[in-house]
Regions:
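Glycine-rich phosphate-binding loop of nucleotide-binding enzymes
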Residues: 1-93
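Helical/strand "switch-coupling" subdomains that flank nucleotide/phosphate-binding cores, especially
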Residues: 81-133
């Protein structure tokens, strides 16, 4: 939750917060599978959005697309929030889905040269011979 210019990132024995006035435009979240990278990114995107900071997020796997809808308030989540002293309630965030094909979201306008050969080959599902042409 963003309160008084801070964004709560996590809490163990101490609170870990990001101070919004000194937040960097770029960052790196790295770690092994299951260490909370996606959860951290989702929390940061939600917090920045609530603070009025625009967020651009490339979600190739679709792990974070759920930001658009409020979550379900489950018992264990409410218990954890209360234990941490958080006044948590599920809420959605403003989301625009960009769609390279312009079918299921906001059309992404790009030229063939801007897309590049690798992505173009994937979009057209080319085989190795076709890619070489």
């Amino acid at each position: 939750m963003a309160t008084s210019g801070t964004l709560l990132i996590g809490q163990g024995e101490t609170v870990q917060a990001l101070h919004l006035p000194v937040a960097n435009r770029h960052g790196l979240i790295a770690g092994a599978t299951g260490t909370g990278k996606t959860t951290t990114l989702r929390l940061m995107a939600e917090g920045f959005s609530r603070a009025g900071v625009p967020v651009f997020l490339a979600d190739v796997k679709g792990d974070i697309a759920g930001l658009a809808k409020p979550g379900e308030p489950k018992g264990f989540i409410l218990e954890r929030a209360a234990k941490m002293g958080l006044d948590w309630k599920p809420e959605g965030s403003p989301v625009v889905f960009w769609d390279l094909f312009g079918v299921q979201g906001h059309p992404l306008r790009a030229t063939v040269s801007e897309i590049g050969p690798v992505l173009l080959a994937q979009m057209l599902q080319l085989n190795d011979t076709q890619e070489g042409v």
